[in-house]
UniProtKB/Swiss-Prot annotation:
Biological classification of the source: Bacteria, Pseudomonadati, Pseudomonadota, Gammaproteobacteria, Pseudomonadales
Protein name stated in the entry: ATP-dependent ubiquitin transferase-like protein Cap2
PANTHER family: TRNA THREONYLCARBAMOYLADENOSINE DEHYDRATASE
MF-aspect GO terms: transferase activity; tRNA threonylcarbamoyladenosine dehydratase; ubiquitin-like modifier activating enzyme activity
Superkingdom, taxonomy of origin: Bacteria
Record remark on domains: Has an N-terminal E2-like domain, a linker and a C-terminal adenylation plus E1-like domain, dimerizes via the E1-like domain.
Organism encoding this protein: Pseudomonas aeruginosa (strain BWHPSA011 / Pa011)
EC class name: transferase
Span list, region Adenylation plus E1-like domain: 306-543
Amino acid sequence: MSSAAAVADVIEAFKQRGFEFVGKTDDGWFRLHGRLTPPQADKGCPCEVQLDPTFFNLPRIRLLEIPPELPAAVPHLGADGGLCYLAKGTVVLDIYDPVGQSLACLQRAAVVFGQIMQGEMIEDLAEEFFAYWHGWHCFVDMQGEDLGRQNCIVAHANGCPLWFITDNEDRTTEKLKSLGYQVTDRTVLTYRVKTGAQPRPLTSNWPPETVGDILAWQSTLDPRCRRKIHERIKEGERKKANGVLIVIESPLMTYGFAVLYDRQSLVQKSKLIDRRDSSYGLKVMPISVVRIDDRYLAQRNMPNSKTLAGKNIAVVGCGTIGGYLSDMLVKAGAGTCGGKLTLVDFDCLLPQNIGRHRLGFPDLLSNKAEAMAKELKRLAPGAEIRALPVDVRHAQLGELDLLIDATGEESLGHWLCGHYPPPTPMLSVWIEGPGTAVRALLRTKASDACYRCLWHSNRRGEFRSITDPLPAILAGHGCEGLYVPFPASVSVHAASLGAEMTLDWVNGVYTPALRTRLIDRAQQLATPDCDPPRDRECPLCNS
């Protein structure tokens, strides 16, 4: 069926339900007017339905007249009448059934509208709070929990001032420089308060326009927090500030508002010796708080798990595995919140490395550890990344929470096992054969098998990755030009396995200690993920 025919069928189906085609929107969607009638209701409300001509997107449904009996703020209904009846991304529209899908959306919208009219779903106001709290953006880069007065940096982006609240000006300034923002010497008086109550808008008198409105609203949520807010506003007034920014930390979200002091009015009132609290009439401006702290950036995609924030981790080898792996570790919080990520590699990036390395042509002939640290600092300015461009056998790594061997070199891996015995946890990650499989082994205590143990077991045919011998494939010419060929996708597989096991480690999951991911589908997996014992022949574990 053609797109035009499908649209015609949908419009005809809506026509049978009392809707009329009235034209197109500026972006080409089809507009229909009719009435949205809740189930078991006698009459409906005038509404507009906008249909995506491709039927990939949910129909937009907007009430043309908001019932006067509804409160100022209700769940799922915007100030312009826009109705949120389904969360985008929660359903997939069947583009081959446009009539059925579009009518189902209309029916769902009618059900939600009916619940709104019945005063149901009020609890959803807390989840939708930011839909009712529009304002100037303020960015928060705070890792500590300290309350009270905070530092606020004012920066310019394309001539527009932006506010950045921070507990570490150097760290935040680095982030702003990476964005190309110009840091000014201006500041805004800022206070941080905490509440145990989730915010939700009032169903009347919304949005708040004065300090009195804010305090009345907060009284319904947390009277103790209301008192703290009022104290900070009056403190700013005593400090002769032009305004004050109040940031409120609630259990699941951070929000705020700015208070603008009317100095001329205050002077006039002081002349009249007006002893009433003049702060209640001050104008307020809602602030949309955007978190940019490193803890949040790492935790956002893993809300119920620990991240690598605060850990001291070293990655030995910044080559085809270590480059991708270190990138993933930083995204998981490595090097942040007091932690440190150390990269060790004495080698330089050569042209033959670029095809399967995280770094690229601009880093040609650069030391891999230094170039990788520079790249990670560009991506995560708040992270502490240390580069050691030396042979790891001559490096002083200090006390570590986790040592990762990403070199893929057996002899060096054995040396690391002997030089960094338990209780230092060690993770070895490597690629077997020409990208046949990727493997990783975690050792957290003395009774665990080490990388050398696995070498002895493999010689006896135990704990191997595949049932057949590993293919011996080399490419290149001459002794110095030979190499094992495999694409960058194999390196990413290995790095992903290493990142997965690192996150398991920080969350207290140490088993299975040996994990294998088969890449070559022509081969058969020999050893399922398991916990190999110490090998009786290992000189490191039996000395």
